[in-house]
Design a protein with these regions (language model features):
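Conserved acetyl-CoA-binding loop-helix of GNAT-fold acetyltransferases
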Residues: 73-90
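Active-site rim helix/loop that mediates acceptor-substrate recognition in acyltransferases
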Residues: 22-47
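Active-site beta-strand termini and strand-to-loop segments that position acidic
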Residues: 47-49, 123-126
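A conserved beta-turn-beta hairpin within the catalytic core of GNAT-like acetyltransferases
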Residues: 59-68, 115-118
């Protein structure tokens, strides 16, 4: 498996992600919430045998970095762990996590913050002195 890192408006991003982001099954897996990107995003894309098996977009915001929509084919834990391991923020990393993926994010060092019905806010603190 290869993890690609692409800027939010790179043409290659749209070629890789477009077919998935417009696929009704993928949108259902994301609770029918559309995927979005701007120049403030970095995308981490898992590719295996020329197929995209998952992606994690990370948005840079004033308080840190945010993962708020991601996709992994068949909820493959190994792919999600690899994608999360590729993300190396310089600041706090927040994630809005689907409840079914809470244990995976927790095992990758994220801590639970507020819990909602379908999602959990989690944080990975990159400043070890806090």
């Amino acid at each position: 498996m290869e993890i690609l890192q692409l800027d939010g408006l790179e043409p290659q991003l749209f070629n890789l992600i477009g077919p998935l982001a417009m696929n009704p099954k993928v949108l259902r897996a994301n609770n029918n919430y559309p995927f979005k990107t701007t120049e403030r995003f970095q995308w981490y894309i898992a590719v295996e045998d020329s197929d995209v098996t998952g992606f994690v977009p990370v948005e840079q915001k004033s308080g840190g970095y945010v993962i708020n929509n991601y996709y992994v084919h068949n909820d493959d834990q190994e792919v999600l762990v690899e994608l999360l391991g590729a993300v190396k923020p310089k600041n706090n990393l927040y994630a809005i996590v689907q409840t079914k993926h809470e244990a995976i994010f927790s095992n990758c060092g994220f801590q639970t913050e507020p819990r909602w019905t379908n999602y959990i806010k989690m944080i990975y603190n990159t400043n070890k002195n806090e």
